[in-house]
Amino acid sequence: MFRLTSVGCILLVIAFLNLVGLTNACTSEGYSCSSDSNCCKNVCCWNVCESHCRHPGKRTRLQGFFKHRR
């Protein structure tokens, strides 16, 4: 009787820990986010989880400027 109860308690604890782990899951790279704390790597750039924020260089901004002028 004691073994059955202790095994049941252990399984209940494992199930509870899995439930807590699922509710605090972080967002993977490439998925949408609202803040840095939502992302696994804690970098939310332009509402998307990234490994690091990329800031476009002068050439990229200039090309974008000319595309919008047409």
Curated annotation (Swiss-Prot):
It is found in: Secreted. Expressed by the venom duct. Pfam families: Conotoxin_I2 (PF17557). Residues 60-70 form a propeptide. One of its GO terms (molecular function) is toxin activity. The keyword Signal applies. Disulfide bonds join C26-C40, C33-C45, C39-C49, C44-C53. InterPro entries: Conotoxin-I_CS, Conotoxin_I2. Residues 1-25 form the signal peptide. GO terms for cellular component: extracellular region. Transmembrane segments: none annotated. The modification Proline amide is found at P56. Keywords: Amidation, Cleavage on pair of basic residues, Disulfide bond, Neurotoxin, Secreted, Signal, Toxin. The keyword Disulfide bond applies. The mature protein is identical to the Conus litteratus toxin AC C7DQX6. Belongs to the conotoxin I2 superfamily. The cysteine framework is XI (C-C-CC-CC-C-C). Probable neurotoxin. This is Conotoxin Im11.11.
